[in-house]
Amino acid sequence: DKQILDDLQNEVKRVCTSSRNWTEWSGTMEQWITDIAGWDKDDSSTIVEAGSILPTQMFESVSTNIQSLCKQINASYEHNLYDCTAVIMRRLLEGLLVLAYQNHDIESEITEKSGWHFTLDKIIKNAAQNKKLALSANTKRDMPLFKDIGNFSAHKIWYNSTKQDIEPHILKYRVIIEELMYKAGVK
């Protein structure tokens, strides 16, 4: 409580000394009151994003779990959290591939005897040659890139993903994900 009061006192002093007139000071005070009145209404579960990698219209009609991953990809990229972006991009790629296999009734082709799915590397290799999935040439070619970026961000101790690692490949990713959404039957 003491820290809150000290912070408030310092902030009030700053506003008083920096305000040039009564209108400016009272405007700041009114904004504080509005902010404080809404504290109990804060929505901490809504993901705020602007569609920087995956446009909202691309995923607004799919299941909520896929929507959440798409929103997390956009929001993490927009907030410069590039390792997060890379890992979630990989996760969405893998999830949609598995759903595509399920949608085509060929999930057994990527499932071990134990019931676990193959590694993403093996799934991508199978998908690239799989006649039932019939993926486009660019999707076959570009999927390994996003597996690698996601793996580097998740597992390489000395690697940090940067905007330059992701930005040049946004269109490729968008094309892959949209194709997989259709192949998975979620769109």
What residue ranges belong to the model's regions?
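Internal, Lys/Arg-enriched amphipathic helical interaction segments that engage polyanionic partners
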Residues: D1-S61, E178-Y182
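Amphipathic alpha-helical interaction surfaces
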Residues: E11-R14, S18, G95-N103, N126-N130, ...
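Charge-enriched, short contiguous segments at helix-coil
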Residues: S19-E30, A134-K187
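Inter-repeat boundary and helix-capping residues of tandem alpha-helical solenoids
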Residues: V62-S63, Y82
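Generic alpha-helical secondary structure signal
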Residues: T64-S68, T119-K122, R141, L145-I149
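Solvent-exposed, amphipathic alpha-helical segments
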Residues: N65-S76, I149-K156
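Short, hydrophobic, well-ordered secondary-structure elements
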Residues: C70-Q102
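Short, charged amphipathic alpha-helical segments flanked by flexible coils
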Residues: Y101-T139
